[in-house]
Amino acid sequence: MMTDQEIRAAIERREIILDPPDFARIEPASYDVRVGNWAFASSSKEKINLKEKGLLVIDPGEFAVLESRERVELDNKTAAQLGLRSEYARRGLLMLSGPQIDPGFGGILVVRMINLAPKPIAMPYEAPFLTLQFFRLSNPVSKPYSGPQQGQFGISAQDIQELIETEGMTLGQVTKTLGALAKDVAELRGSVGRLSWVLPLIVAVGMAVVGAVVALK
């Protein structure tokens, strides 16, 4: 794993390209990547311009796709590992994307997330939300990365479509449904509780009426 000094030197030699670069975001053994221009949340059904709106709010149980502010490019001797910053993980956010970034990759990072917490989580524009750890290989790879994410410029229509197709009922919708069901059950219990003393009263009144009728005979 590369240290802060090694990361800085690799950026200066352009073995690692982070555009726009910011040396202040270099940590002891990692680099913090920021929230980018666009996002998509399962409840909105459309892309959200974070540069204009300022932040993305991910509701409980909601899925979201975010892109990085930085374009990342690795040479053929450098690999990276991607992870969610601990402050967001502690608050209940879970990253659903693979952590490996292969040598030769170049493009905007696109990650899927879900909020497993009972409260909404805000993702401000340009806030550090991902951390990159870099690894220098002893030799260049023979086959640099050339997969479907190569050269991606951000969230694509395919990213959105895949999220919509795999979403089904979100945890948020499940939570709301269970909440409504719990409310109905509580109301039913209340009704049953009221009947528990109303019914004996009705029976008593009925018996009194019957007794009076019998006495009149």
How would you label these PLM feature ranges?
Residues A204-G211:
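Single-pass alpha-helical transmembrane signal-anchor segments
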Residues M1-L199, A212-K217:
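DUTPase catalytic domain/fold
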